[in-house]
């Protein structure tokens, strides 16, 4: 309504409806015991992304997936991505409404999450995780080709996009600008931090050059 002034009894109003709604929602969420577990599962999913991007970068143009440790890092990334994302999907609805553990499997809450930006991103992420499994197994058996590069590149970009386009930047008024910027940031962090993680797991095998790669 034009000219309406939003307020809440007992608080100082900012004069904007968005700020008031955000304030109320935050107070409701703070009452939920799911905040810490939800944050942990978000980190687990992000760690899975880092491992997958690290494997992608270090394996590019090589037969490095022949290495049991590198393949283990890739499969571990898929498992973490799936487990963290599905846990976030289940917990998100109850956390938003201030609910507890007894509310996580309520159909209404899960349905609300499924139709949100985050829910759609997680569903896409699950599909991409299955594709990661197939591609990792395929590239383990086949020699590297230009098609391998396309598969790896597309999967990496799309998986990172499920994080960038469901996070805070995608909710901004200039989401068309900030979401792609966040995607670039995630890609850069994933290539660097993920690469370091994979090196920590399989550094000796990579350094030996036994699989067509060298550091």
Which residue stretches match the model-derived regions?
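Polytopic transmembrane helical bundles with strong interfacial aromatic enrichment
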Residues: 1-215
């Amino acid at each position: 309504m034009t000219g309406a002034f939003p307020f809440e009894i007992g608080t100082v109003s900012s004069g904007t409806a968005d700020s008031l709604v955000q304030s109320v929602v935050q107070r409701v969420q703070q009452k939920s015991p799911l905040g810490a577990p939800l944050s942990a599962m978000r980190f687990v999913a992000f760690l899975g992304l880092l491992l997958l991007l690290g494997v992608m970068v270090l394996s590019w143009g090589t037969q490095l997936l022949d290495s049991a440790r590198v393949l283990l890092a890739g499969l571990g990334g898929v498992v973490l991505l799936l487990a963290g994302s599905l846990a976030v999907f289940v917990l998100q609805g109850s956390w938003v409404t201030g609910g507890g553990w007894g509310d996580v499997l309520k159909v209404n809450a899960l349905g609300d999450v499924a139709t949100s930006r985050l829910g759609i991103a997680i569903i896409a992420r699950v599909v991409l995780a299955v594709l990661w499994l197939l591609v990792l197994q395929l590239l383990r058996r086949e020699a590297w080709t230009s098609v391998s590069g396309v598969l790896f590149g597309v999967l990496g970009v799309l998986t990172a996009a499920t994080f960038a386009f469901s996070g805070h930047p995608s909710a901004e008024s200039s989401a068309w600008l900030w979401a792609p910027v966040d995607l670039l940031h995630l890609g850069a962090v994933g290539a660097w931090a993920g690469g370091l993680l994979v090196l920590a797991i399989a550094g000796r095998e990579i350094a030996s050059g036994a699989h067509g790669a060298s550091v």
